[in-house]
Swiss-Prot record:
The lineage of its organism: Eukaryota, Viridiplantae, Streptophyta, Embryophyta, Tracheophyta. Keywords: Nucleus, Ubl conjugation pathway. Pfam families: Skp1, Skp1_POZ. This is SKP1-like protein 10. GO terms for biological process: auxin-activated signaling pathway; jasmonic acid mediated signaling pathway; protein ubiquitination; response to auxin; response to jasmonic acid; ubiquitin-dependent protein catabolic process. SMART domains: Skp1. It comes from Arabidopsis thaliana. Expressed in young seedlings, roots, leaves, floral stems, inflorescences, and siliques.
Amino acid sequence: MSTKKIILKSSDGHSFEVEEEAACQCQTIAHMSEDDCTDNGIPLPEVTGKILEMVIEYCNKHHVDAANPCSDEDLKKWDKEFMEKYQSTIFDLIMAANYLNIKSLLDLACQTVADMIKDNTVEHTRKFFNIENDYTHEEEEAVRRENQWGFE
């Protein structure tokens, strides 16, 4: 028995043929599928081909059924390796997971970022997120005094 396929079109013109059941982990796509709006492909103007390929890889792995069994332990190991593999594009993955409404990928990517910055200094976190410190030295000291408990 053949599985229905749908075409996903990235913002930069790449097209990907994906099993509908795997793609429907994206709630955005699932709603379009329910409304029979998939015949001509689904344009995804907020997701590049590079990132869409990663999202599809994630969805294919997480589409577990009789033909594609996977234990929770194996899936957790795969998720960890997936995040390590795509660490340099993690913020793009977060944006795509949010846009496509893939809660499990969004949660995984956000937790990965949280784990990456926990126990780091403010300066390291600023550098990690490329945030410029716009406080004067005096303002920064005042904030530290007012919130001393947070720096202990």
